[in-house]
């Protein structure tokens, strides 16, 4: 299977996309990690074979909806995991945030919408109340990178951060 991993902000997303890509490649998949402009260019030129397009959000903009439709029409599957999870928001603010980040239409365009945890899972299921089976709690590979197995990759911090951060 061809897997296309969309990176918007490399500093924030590249390590986790590399983790996903390495795991997928080790299982026999072909993986391309790229920004959206190069993926769009490859699609226009007809050089990308159908596969899974995994994006960093399904914000319901006209451009994104049309791009996902072109992918689907060319037999791609669209999946997403929102990179900006809104973890520190109150329930009401998280609901508002996710309503801006997803819509019934963009959820329905997606073969799978992956969630960080129970809060975003429930809110996204409420947005797309007719078909909830494509909304799945998986956690985030960004958080997986915090595990002790990756300590050699990151190294030990010289000092403890002053405030919580992601």
Task: Briefly describe each language-model feature range.
Residues 160-166:
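Conserved donor-binding/catalytic core segment of Leloir-type glycosyltransferases
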Residues 2-158:
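Active-site and donor-binding regions of nucleotide-sugar-utilizing enzymes
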């Amino acid at each position: 299977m061809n897997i296309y991993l969309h990176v918007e902000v490399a500093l924030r997303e590249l390590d986790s996309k590399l983790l996903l890509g390495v795991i997928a490649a080790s299982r026999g998949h072909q993986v391309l990690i790229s920004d959206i402009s190069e993926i769009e260019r490859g699609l226009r030129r007809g050089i990308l074979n159908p596969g899974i397009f995994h994006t960093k959000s399904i914000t319901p903009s006209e451009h994104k909806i049309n791009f996902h439709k072109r992918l689907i029409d060319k037999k791609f599957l669209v999946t997403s995991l929102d990179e900006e999870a809104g973890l520190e928001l109150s329930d009401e603010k998280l609901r508002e945030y996710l309503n801006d980040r997803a819509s019934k239409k963009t959820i329905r365009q997606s073969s799978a919408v992956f969630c960080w945890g129970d809060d975003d899972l429930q809110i996204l299921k409420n947005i797309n109340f007719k078909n909830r089976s494509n909304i799945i709690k998986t956690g985030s590979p960004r958080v997986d990178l915090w595990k002790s197995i990756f300590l050699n990759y990151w190294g030990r911090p010289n000092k403890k951060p002053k405030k919580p951060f992601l």
